[in-house]
């Protein structure tokens, strides 16, 4: 299976500025099988024409709170949360095929039915695929911080993204974000504070009424090995 045959190939939807880098990666035979056999069940095909907005109740076969995770990597956090919360439905967006393949294999192994995957740009997913006020939560764990100043425009959390995110969240929804890069943490906190859509961020490590509920991710473990402080907040969506 080559990159042109992959479902939801992100190259088919150009963007002026991407917040991610398309890394080359080889699919294992197991991942190739997962994309061929499991994607039709758990994957969401890329939109065509004007028919892209999804009926999420039809997609999952029920009505339930929905959580979107952007940049799921190999799906560790997404699947851990989905397994612990069978009363919720989980959507994951990832542009790298090996990560999607691994996640599909784990969905099969764990017997999960409350997970669906996009293999396309998450901004496009939010803008084109999801109805307004359809998400109970949005998760963004350890996004690329784009360290160099000339690349800061590529950071995902910018005012237009926050406006889009607020439109897709329910009035009692939340944004759960974590990073190991302090300058990006300051940037995220500043953008959210001035947006008018979110309340003060809650540190799940210091709140008895809130729990992170996510496992240690590969990028977080790397940050810890390098001595980076972990910054994590849950921002409640303010009612309109």
Where are these regions (language model features)?
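S-adenosyl-L-methionine
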Residues: 1-68, 76-83
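SAM cofactor-binding core of SAM-dependent methyltransferases
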Residues: 65-127
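A short acidic, Gly/Pro-enriched loop at the edge of an enzyme's catalytic core
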Residues: 127-137
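A short SAM/SAH-binding and catalytic strip from SAM-dependent methyltransferases
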Residues: 135-155
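Class I S-adenosylmethionine-dependent transferase superfamily signal
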Residues: 138, 165-166, 175, 188
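A short glycine-rich, Lys/Arg-flanked "PGG" loop and its adjoining helix->strand segment in the class I
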Residues: 157-171
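Conserved beta-strand signature within the Rossmann-like core of class I S-adenosyl-L-methionine
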Residues: 171-179
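Class I S-adenosyl-L-methionine
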Residues: 186-240
